[in-house]
Amino acid sequence: MSSGRIVQIIGAVIDVEFPRDVVPSVYNALKVQGAETTLEVQQQLGDGVVRTIAMGSTEGLKRGLDVVDTGAAISVPVGKATLGRIMDVLGNPIDEAGPIGEEERRGIHQPAPSFADQAGGNDLLETGIKVIDLVCPFAKGGKVGLFGGAGVGKTVNMMELIRNIAMEHSGYSVFAGVGERTREGNDFYHEMKDSNVLDKVALVYGQMNEPPGNRLRVALTGLTMAEKFRDEGNDVLLFVDNIYRYTLAGTEVSALLGRMPSAVGYQPTLAEEMGVLQERITSTKEGSITSVQAVYVPADDLTDPSPATTFAHLDATVVLSRDIASLGIYPAVDPLDSTSRQLDPNVIGNEHYDTARGVQYVLQRYKELKDIIAILGMDELSEDDKQLVARARKIQRFLSQPFFVAEVFTGSPGKYVSLKDTIAGFSGILKGDYDHLPEQAFYMVGSIDEAIEKAKKL
């Protein structure tokens, strides 16, 4: 255990000088004596000086304080003891429920599974959300991104997915809150508690008010816990809200470390940092990790380097659109922009595939006709186009659905719709079985039977 002393402090970046023969390795954890602060080595500057990033507040630190090298990377508790607990980036409990009592700790920097260890699969994961199951179905052991700008419903969608999948899935889940609102973390905890699934979820929070070091590493902390469950042969769910804040923390750290910025001011190592995280989120022959990641899209621009880098790693992308949210259709998923590798007749079957493509065709055609309708009105359309527009408007409304986690706001009970009912409903609308029903009947209902019942009351 070698010791050094602080020689410079610039915000969250601290330079520590060690004797030249015992300079700590990159990613080693250092402890500041007399303070609770942990530092992580990022660079070796030469002459025994290392540049570190603080995993916590640097208030009260000063030059000359003694720092001890722990000789290992940051390690966090793993295993069953973490379930039902809220932890910070270092694995310390922050739920005031006593120590974690873990049997094992694991370093947060682990190599990704080798190519030979990885396993693929084509099993579908039913979510109970119509638009997702129809147009961008999830794969078990796959990676899903929820893309959206500010305030279009990423967190609500994620909470609904967690509720539906965790309730039905009955396996273990890990939730990593990366640079999000503390209020949402609190809501999430109570939501899990009320749904009686808290004893199957490990929660790791590094919220908006934390220093950049915490936000940069908290995703790795959550992932390390998920990897342990996977290696024990479980199918794990990993939820990350929000992966963009992980990138942003990397940008802040990169600037503080004095690296040259790249496009739009992002860190030059953006693709590598994203790859290091994403390559570890994978299924092996022991068990699977299915991950759902919320991705904030700055200024609704999907070509921004951060969301664009994330796209490459995902199996399914759920794009939330402000235009659809402005119509009052929630979940505001854009069925034309959202994609999935599972949308293949060999995987999901012909009926599902044809229905999904039929829905997309009708909505795309309606989008093209909107300009004509705006200029000339509906009367100028051919009879076929009038019929298509009527069906498109019904489909658009039928893609909406009341959520369980939003009952408090909407006042209407949540609905879980099975994949079979989803396909039956949409294929019925496409065939014209429900042309006689008013379009309002399709808004905010679960299955097609509820739409028929609602039509009787209109």
From Swiss-Prot:
Main location per the UniProt record: membrane
SUPFAM superfamilies: C-terminal domain of alpha and beta subunits of F1 ATP synthase, N-terminal domain of alpha and beta subunits of F1 ATP synthase, P-loop containing nucleoside triphosphate hydrolases
Cellular component, GO annotation: plasma membrane; proton-transporting ATP synthase complex
Top EC group: translocase
Source organism superkingdom: Bacteria
Residues annotated for ATP binding in this entry: G148, G149, A150, G151, V152, G153, K154, T155
Database matches in InterPro entries: AAA+_ATPase (IPR003593), ATP-synt_VA_C (IPR055190), ATP_synth_F1_bsu (IPR005722), ATPase_a/bsu_AS (IPR020003), ATPase_alpha/beta_chains (IPR050053), ATPase_F1/V1/A1_a/bsu_N (IPR004100), ATPase_F1/V1/A1_a/bsu_N_sf (IPR036121), ATPase_F1/V1/A1_a/bsu_nucl-bd (IPR000194)
Annotated GO MF terms: ATP binding; ATP hydrolysis activity; proton-transporting ATP synthase activity, rotational mechanism
UniProt keyword terms in alphabetical order: ATP synthesis, ATP-binding, Cell inner membrane, Cell membrane, CF(1), Hydrogen ion transport, Ion transport, Membrane, Nucleotide-binding, Translocase, Transport
Compartments in which it is found: Cell inner membrane
UniProt similarity note: Belongs to the ATPase alpha/beta chains family.
Oligomeric and partner information: F-type ATPases have 2 components, CF(1) - the catalytic core - and CF(0) - the membrane proton channel. CF(1) has five subunits: alpha(3), beta(3), gamma(1), delta(1), epsilon(1). CF(0) has three main subunits: a(1), b(2) and c(9-12). The alpha and beta chains form an alternating ring which encloses part of the gamma chain. CF(1) is attached to CF(0) by a central stalk formed by the gamma and epsilon chains, while a peripheral stalk is formed by the delta and b chains.
Matching HAMAP family: ATP_synth_beta_bact
Protein name per its UniProtKB record: ATP synthase subunit beta
Organism of provenance: Pseudomonas putida (strain GB-1)
Gene giving rise to this polypeptide: atpD
